[in-house]
Amino acid sequence: MLNDFTGADKVYIACGSTDLRKGIDGLARLVQQQFELDPFTNTLFLFCGRRRDRIKGLYWEKDGFILLYKRLEQGAYQWPRSESEVKVLTPQQYRWLMEGLQIEQPKAHRPVTGLTTV
């Protein structure tokens, strides 16, 4: 479910590690107080533990929160380490993260704009 989550307008990741003992209220408070964002929007917020092998997702669904949890059996997420920062992800970056890749792919093909024929 988390790998192909498409219900949210935006996806934010909390960079660095988060204490995953926090539940819905603790994570929602973190979103509001530390990142100054509104958790009651159509947004998926992702948090990663210290070992980077598990993540939690917080999502508001019109009448209540959904708390998602995923633990990898092997490997680790390529999670940005800078503390107290939140980043918005593009759909492509979200797919990369769920596939175990870094969200910043310097060698990825960039979209071409302003084409003309010769």
Task: Give the positions of each predicted feature.
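Polybasic/polar functional segments that serve as interface/processing modules
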Residues: 1-118
